Amino acid sequence: MLYSLVHKISVLAIKLFFNQISLQNKQIVPNQGPVIFVANHPNFFMDPLIAGSYCPRNLYFFAKSTLFNSSIRKWILTRLNLVPVYRKIDDEDNMGKNKDSFKKGYEILENNGAFLIFPEGVSIGKRVLEKLKTGAARIGLEAESKNDFDLNIFVIPIGLSYSDQIRFRSNVMIRFGNPIKIKDFEKDYKLNKVDAVKKVTSIIRKSLNELTNYYQTDQIEDIVQGLELIYKMELMTELGMEVDNKNDDFITSKILTDAVQWYEKNEPYHITNFRRKLSEYVALLKKLDIRDEFLDPARQEKRNWGKTRTILFLIIGSPLFLWGIITNYIPYILPRIIVKTSNKDQSEEASWKLIYGFIFFAIYYIASTTLVWGLTQNLLVTILFSVSLIPSGDFALYYSKNIKKYKQHVKFLSIFYKKRSLLFEIIQKRMELLQYIEESKNRYLDTLEGKDTNYG
């Protein structure tokens, strides 16, 4: 009962928080039978909500034991299908209690149930997969061993990728990976239990890396982000991909990441050279306070039409924008203020924004609708008012983004007339970067000849 209610609320909250939710390979998930879902963990609270809401199975969740630190919390979380996991970093003395947690995992699988576990064990908020704990592999193998390897347990990896981990109305992609059949490791387990657990964990890690836009190390983060900034759209066009397609966007980021990782391993001096050129270019962008897209000739035609369309949109849409601000600004800004002043970790920001936002918007919408009813005593007016709240809020956000784009355009024109020499300098830097990228790309592609690289 409580699980079902929270599940419905979670789906609604997630749809309101994110602009676009892309779900891939959901058909892979079996409708019945024992399944262990494993996912990466960039966002401590949002990840289980998203995975649990869009997984086609009722789930149990293995969560850190510190969440169960009061009798009330324990009562609630237990009824939400949460199972405590005792971590060494929290309290080494309680590690022995994990026997009960593992036992619960066996029971779930033996009853053809499914549970979700985050094998990283921590949520850092970076695009780097942390060292995986072996719990998922151990539970799966030991459950099969206790039942003569007849349970037919599958481990299904889930890749969670956020376009922006902390921004409201950003995008998220959920990718289900190929099932890992635990029975396939029966011989390995009987030969050497520890090695079998490590083998399954290694396969899980490989799968999660394939399903996410993660780096092997955060030392190349600035390089990949720089390429995504100035070259991703051009590469997508060159590859015949759709710029607005989230899967194509993901694949392109993966291609760029793989290329950078190859260079870091084989020709690191090119990484150093590119980092220097990139930092000089980004410094000029910041100095002029403009975005890279305004320097991209490929977007010029689209931008010219976009300028006219934006002006018309800003004029025609201004009344609805004002209505959206009046009816949504207070519950929109309060969560941001609270999260900012409380200095939350980046991996927690979006989660707390979602929690506070859901509370404030619910209270504000109910209170304002009640007020309108009290003032008008008109059912039709009250219904129209309440129905307008969410769409007008979404429109206000979209409108404000267009205002920012237009301000950038005006600033670009101002720079063109007042700081032309500096603008030409930054354009020259950009051209040098693109030439360096093209040369590096061709050199990298030469190394891939004869190799079968699959990003789908």
Where are these regions (language model features)?
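Non-catalytic C-terminal accessory region of glycerolipid acyltransferases
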Residues: 89, 94-300, 385-456
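Catalytic core of membrane glycerolipid acyltransferases/transacylases, capturing the structured
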Residues: 2-5, 29-94, 331-346
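C-terminal non-catalytic accessory extensions
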Residues: 284-310, 314, 318, 330-331
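Hydrophobic alpha-helical transmembrane segments
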Residues: 349-355, 359, 370-391
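A short, well-structured juxtamembrane/interface segment
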Residues: 13-33, 440-454
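Alpha-helical transmembrane segments with an aromatic anchor "belt"
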Residues: 303-308, 312, 335-359
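A conditional alpha-helix N-cap/helix-loop micro-motif detector
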Residues: 19, 41, 95-99
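A transmembrane-helix-recognition feature enriched in membrane-embedded lipid enzymes
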Residues: 1-23, 71-80, 307-341, 365-376, ...
